[in-house]
Protein backbone atom coordinates (compact mmCIF):
# COMPACT_ATOMS: atom_id res chain seq x y z
CA UNK A 1 0.00 0.00 0.00
CA UNK A 2 2.94 2.32 0.48
CA UNK A 3 3.32 2.23 -3.29
CA UNK A 4 0.29 4.50 -3.77
CA UNK A 5 1.33 7.18 -1.27
CA UNK A 6 2.86 9.47 -3.89
CA UNK A 7 -0.10 9.04 -6.21
CA UNK A 8 -2.67 9.81 -3.54
CA UNK A 9 -0.84 12.89 -2.27
CA UNK A 10 -0.32 14.39 -5.71
CA UNK A 11 -3.86 13.79 -6.95
CA UNK A 12 -5.48 15.19 -3.80
CA UNK A 13 -3.25 18.18 -3.03
CA UNK A 14 -5.44 20.77 -4.78
CA UNK A 15 -8.58 19.58 -3.02
CA UNK A 16 -6.76 19.59 0.29
CA UNK A 17 -5.73 23.20 0.00
CA UNK A 18 -9.32 24.15 -0.79
CA UNK A 19 -10.46 22.45 2.39
CA UNK A 20 -13.30 20.68 0.69
CA UNK A 21 -13.81 17.98 3.32
CA UNK A 22 -13.18 17.20 6.96
CA UNK A 23 -11.32 14.26 8.43
CA UNK A 24 -12.30 12.25 11.49
CA UNK A 25 -9.57 12.57 14.06
CA UNK A 26 -8.05 9.27 15.19
CA UNK A 27 -8.71 8.28 18.79
CA UNK A 28 -5.74 7.75 21.07
CA UNK A 29 -6.00 4.46 22.92
CA UNK A 30 -8.15 2.92 20.22
CA UNK A 31 -8.33 -0.40 22.10
CA UNK A 32 -10.51 1.39 24.69
CA UNK A 33 -12.80 2.99 22.12
CA UNK A 34 -16.35 1.79 21.46
CA UNK A 35 -15.51 2.06 17.75
CA UNK A 36 -13.04 -0.83 17.88
CA UNK A 37 -12.03 -3.90 19.90
CA UNK A 38 -9.55 -4.52 22.72
CA UNK A 39 -6.44 -5.54 20.80
CA UNK A 40 -4.27 -5.14 23.89
CA UNK A 41 -4.71 -8.47 25.65
CA UNK A 42 -2.75 -10.17 28.47
CA UNK A 43 -1.48 -12.87 26.11
CA UNK A 44 -1.19 -13.52 22.38
CA UNK A 45 -3.77 -16.33 22.31
CA UNK A 46 -6.50 -14.05 23.64
CA UNK A 47 -5.39 -11.34 21.21
CA UNK A 48 -5.78 -13.74 18.27
CA UNK A 49 -9.21 -14.77 19.55
CA UNK A 50 -10.39 -11.17 19.99
CA UNK A 51 -9.04 -10.15 16.58
CA UNK A 52 -10.62 -13.07 14.75
CA UNK A 53 -13.98 -12.38 16.40
CA UNK A 54 -13.78 -8.71 15.42
CA UNK A 55 -12.99 -9.62 11.82
CA UNK A 56 -15.79 -12.18 11.71
CA UNK A 57 -18.31 -9.54 12.77
CA UNK A 58 -16.91 -6.48 10.96
CA UNK A 59 -15.01 -7.53 7.83
CA UNK A 60 -16.49 -6.64 4.45
CA UNK A 61 -16.00 -10.05 2.86
CA UNK A 62 -15.05 -10.14 -0.81
CA UNK A 63 -15.67 -13.77 -1.74
CA UNK A 64 -17.88 -16.63 -0.62
CA UNK A 65 -15.27 -18.45 1.50
CA UNK A 66 -15.28 -16.35 4.66
CA UNK A 67 -13.11 -18.83 6.56
CA UNK A 68 -10.25 -18.38 4.09
CA UNK A 69 -10.48 -14.59 4.29
CA UNK A 70 -10.47 -14.75 8.09
CA UNK A 71 -7.44 -17.03 8.07
CA UNK A 72 -5.54 -14.71 5.71
CA UNK A 73 -6.25 -11.55 7.71
CA UNK A 74 -6.07 -12.79 11.31
CA UNK A 75 -2.93 -12.56 13.45
CA UNK A 76 -1.34 -15.94 14.03
CA UNK A 77 1.29 -17.86 15.95
CA UNK A 78 3.53 -20.72 14.83
CA UNK A 79 5.15 -22.95 17.45
CA UNK A 80 8.24 -25.08 16.72
CA UNK A 81 8.12 -28.81 17.34
CA UNK A 82 10.79 -28.65 20.04
CA UNK A 83 11.05 -26.40 23.08
CA UNK A 84 12.80 -23.12 22.31
CA UNK A 85 14.14 -19.96 23.92
CA UNK A 86 13.93 -18.02 20.63
CA UNK A 87 11.00 -15.95 19.36
CA UNK A 88 10.16 -13.52 16.56
CA UNK A 89 7.43 -10.90 16.19
CA UNK A 90 6.53 -9.85 12.63
CA UNK A 91 4.60 -6.70 11.61
CA UNK A 92 3.05 -6.03 8.19
CA UNK A 93 2.90 -2.76 6.26
CA UNK A 94 0.22 -0.16 5.51
CA UNK A 95 -2.89 -1.71 3.98
CA UNK A 96 -1.43 -5.20 4.19
CA UNK A 97 -2.20 -8.25 6.35
CA UNK A 98 -0.43 -10.96 8.37
CA UNK A 99 -0.57 -13.14 5.25
CA UNK A 100 2.35 -11.14 3.83
CA UNK A 101 4.60 -12.90 6.35
CA UNK A 102 3.26 -16.43 5.91
CA UNK A 103 6.36 -17.76 4.10
CA UNK A 104 8.90 -16.00 6.33
CA UNK A 105 7.04 -17.16 9.43
CA UNK A 106 7.23 -20.78 8.25
CA UNK A 107 10.95 -20.44 7.60
CA UNK A 108 11.56 -19.03 11.08
CA UNK A 109 9.53 -21.70 12.86
CA UNK A 110 11.39 -24.38 10.90
CA UNK A 111 14.58 -22.89 12.34
CA UNK A 112 13.35 -23.23 15.90
CA UNK A 113 11.68 -19.86 16.52
CA UNK A 114 8.28 -19.31 18.04
CA UNK A 115 6.70 -16.83 15.62
CA UNK A 116 3.92 -14.32 16.21
CA UNK A 117 2.48 -12.18 13.42
CA UNK A 118 0.47 -9.06 14.32
CA UNK A 119 -2.54 -7.44 12.69
CA UNK A 120 -2.15 -3.66 12.94
CA UNK A 121 -5.32 -1.83 14.09
CA UNK A 122 -7.52 -0.72 11.20
CA UNK A 123 -6.45 -3.59 8.96
CA UNK A 124 -8.05 -6.83 7.81
CA UNK A 125 -11.66 -5.66 8.02
CA UNK A 126 -12.41 -2.82 5.61
CA UNK A 127 -10.47 0.26 4.43
CA UNK A 128 -12.83 2.58 6.34
CA UNK A 129 -11.38 1.23 9.57
CA UNK A 130 -8.06 2.88 8.72
CA UNK A 131 -9.81 6.15 9.59
CA UNK A 132 -9.65 5.06 13.26
CA UNK A 133 -6.04 4.36 14.36
CA UNK A 134 -3.14 6.70 14.93
CA UNK A 135 0.58 5.99 14.78
CA UNK A 136 0.46 5.72 18.59
CA UNK A 137 -2.00 2.81 18.37
CA UNK A 138 0.30 0.91 16.00
CA UNK A 139 3.36 1.53 18.15
CA UNK A 140 1.43 0.55 21.27
CA UNK A 141 0.45 -2.87 19.93
CA UNK A 142 4.01 -3.59 18.74
CA UNK A 143 5.52 -2.52 22.06
CA UNK A 144 2.99 -4.51 24.09
CA UNK A 145 3.41 -7.88 22.38
CA UNK A 146 7.16 -7.39 22.16
CA UNK A 147 7.28 -6.93 25.93
CA UNK A 148 5.35 -10.18 26.43
CA UNK A 149 7.90 -12.05 24.31
CA UNK A 150 10.98 -10.55 25.97
CA UNK A 151 9.54 -11.56 29.35
CA UNK A 152 9.35 -15.20 28.22
CA UNK A 153 12.22 -15.76 25.74
CA UNK A 154 15.97 -15.20 25.91
CA UNK A 155 16.30 -14.30 22.22
CA UNK A 156 13.70 -12.06 20.54
CA UNK A 157 13.90 -10.83 16.96
CA UNK A 158 11.57 -8.22 15.49
CA UNK A 159 10.68 -8.15 11.81
CA UNK A 160 8.68 -5.72 9.73
CA UNK A 161 7.72 -4.76 6.22
CA UNK A 162 7.62 -1.07 5.23
CA UNK A 163 5.58 0.67 7.97
CA UNK A 164 6.00 -2.42 10.14
CA UNK A 165 9.77 -2.08 9.78
CA UNK A 166 9.54 1.47 11.11
CA UNK A 167 7.55 0.34 14.13
CA UNK A 168 9.89 -2.50 15.12
CA UNK A 169 12.97 -0.31 14.60
CA UNK A 170 11.56 2.33 16.94
CA UNK A 171 10.97 -0.36 19.55
CA UNK A 172 14.47 -1.80 19.17
CA UNK A 173 16.10 1.61 19.62
CA UNK A 174 14.34 1.93 22.98
CA UNK A 175 14.60 -1.73 23.99
CA UNK A 176 17.86 -3.36 25.11
CA UNK A 177 16.21 -6.79 25.21
CA UNK A 178 15.87 -7.11 21.42
CA UNK A 179 18.33 -9.53 19.81
CA UNK A 180 18.08 -8.31 16.22
CA UNK A 181 15.94 -6.91 13.41
CA UNK A 182 14.63 -8.27 10.10
CA UNK A 183 13.64 -5.30 7.92
CA UNK A 184 11.94 -5.73 4.55
CA UNK A 185 11.68 -2.58 2.41
CA UNK A 186 11.76 -0.37 5.52
CA UNK A 187 9.72 2.77 5.03
CA UNK A 188 12.21 5.13 6.65
CA UNK A 189 11.83 7.64 3.83
CA UNK A 190 10.14 7.84 0.46
CA UNK A 191 11.81 9.09 -2.70
CA UNK A 192 9.61 12.20 -2.45
CA UNK A 193 10.08 13.51 1.11
CA UNK A 194 8.74 16.95 0.15
CA UNK A 195 5.37 15.36 -0.64
CA UNK A 196 5.45 13.33 2.56
CA UNK A 197 5.67 16.58 4.53
CA UNK A 198 2.29 17.64 3.10
CA UNK A 199 0.50 14.58 4.48
CA UNK A 200 -0.64 16.15 7.81
CA UNK A 201 -2.19 19.09 5.94
CA UNK A 202 -4.03 16.87 3.48
CA UNK A 203 -5.16 14.37 6.12
CA UNK A 204 -6.69 17.21 8.15
CA UNK A 205 -9.16 18.08 5.39
CA UNK A 206 -9.60 14.94 3.26
CA UNK A 207 -10.56 11.44 4.34
CA UNK A 208 -9.70 9.44 1.27
CA UNK A 209 -6.57 9.56 -0.82
CA UNK A 210 -7.44 6.69 -3.13
CA UNK A 211 -10.62 4.62 -3.19
CA UNK A 212 -11.53 1.78 -5.49
CA UNK A 213 -13.23 -1.61 -5.49
CA UNK A 214 -11.78 -4.12 -3.03
CA UNK A 215 -10.76 -7.28 -4.90
CA UNK A 216 -7.76 -8.55 -2.93
CA UNK A 217 -8.40 -10.91 -0.02
CA UNK A 218 -5.03 -10.15 1.60
CA UNK A 219 -4.72 -6.36 1.43
CA UNK A 220 -6.62 -3.13 0.85
CA UNK A 221 -6.81 -1.56 -2.59
CA UNK A 222 -8.06 1.73 -1.09
CA UNK A 223 -6.34 3.94 1.47
CA UNK A 224 -7.60 6.78 3.69
CA UNK A 225 -5.19 9.63 4.30
CA UNK A 226 -5.34 8.86 8.02
CA UNK A 227 -3.48 5.62 7.32
CA UNK A 228 -0.91 7.49 5.24
CA UNK A 229 -0.53 9.99 8.07
CA UNK A 230 0.14 7.21 10.58
CA UNK A 231 2.82 5.83 8.26
CA UNK A 232 4.31 9.31 7.80
CA UNK A 233 4.47 9.80 11.57
CA UNK A 234 6.27 6.48 12.00
CA UNK A 235 8.78 7.48 9.32
CA UNK A 236 9.45 10.87 10.91
CA UNK A 237 9.97 9.34 14.34
CA UNK A 238 12.26 6.54 13.15
CA UNK A 239 14.40 9.03 11.18
CA UNK A 240 14.73 11.27 14.23
CA UNK A 241 15.68 8.36 16.48
CA UNK A 242 18.20 6.95 14.02
CA UNK A 243 19.82 10.38 13.85
CA UNK A 244 20.29 10.50 17.62
CA UNK A 245 20.80 6.83 18.50
CA UNK A 246 22.71 3.89 17.08
CA UNK A 247 21.36 0.37 16.92
CA UNK A 248 23.68 -2.08 18.65
CA UNK A 249 21.98 -5.27 17.41
CA UNK A 250 22.34 -7.22 14.14
CA UNK A 251 20.07 -5.88 11.40
CA UNK A 252 19.13 -7.74 8.22
CA UNK A 253 17.75 -5.38 5.55
CA UNK A 254 16.16 -6.47 2.28
CA UNK A 255 15.22 -3.69 -0.15
CA UNK A 256 14.91 -3.42 -3.89
CA UNK A 257 17.38 -1.01 -5.47
CA UNK A 258 14.72 -0.22 -8.07
CA UNK A 259 11.97 0.53 -5.53
CA UNK A 260 9.93 3.39 -6.99
CA UNK A 261 8.69 4.69 -3.62
CA UNK A 262 11.10 3.82 -0.80
CA UNK A 263 14.56 5.40 -0.91
CA UNK A 264 17.03 2.47 -0.57
CA UNK A 265 19.74 4.86 0.62
CA UNK A 266 17.69 6.27 3.51
How would you name each of these model-derived features?
Residues 125-152, 157:
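Catalytic nucleophile-loop/oxyanion-hole region of alpha/beta-hydrolase
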Residues 177-193:
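A conserved short beta-strand
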Residues 18-19:
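C-terminal motif of bacterial Sec signal peptides marking the signal peptidase cleavage site
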Residues 260-265:
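Conserved alpha/beta-hydrolase "acid-adjacent" motif
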Residues 71-120:
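Short, surface-exposed "cap/lid" segments of acyl-processing enzymes
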Residues 34-67, 188-243, 257-258:
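The alpha/beta-hydrolase serine catalytic core
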Residues 247, 253-255, 259:
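Short beta-strand/loop motif that positions the catalytic acidic residue
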Residues 160-164, 168:
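Gly/Ala-rich beta-loop-alpha elbow adjacent to hydrolase catalytic centers
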Amino acid sequence: MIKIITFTIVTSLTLALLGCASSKQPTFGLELSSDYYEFIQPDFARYVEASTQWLRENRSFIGEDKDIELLINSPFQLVPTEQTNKAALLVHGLGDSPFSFSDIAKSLVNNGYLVQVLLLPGHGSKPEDLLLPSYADWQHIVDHYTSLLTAQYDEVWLGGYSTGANLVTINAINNEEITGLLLFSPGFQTRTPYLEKLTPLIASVINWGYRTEETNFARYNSVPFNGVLAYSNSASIVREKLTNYKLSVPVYVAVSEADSIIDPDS
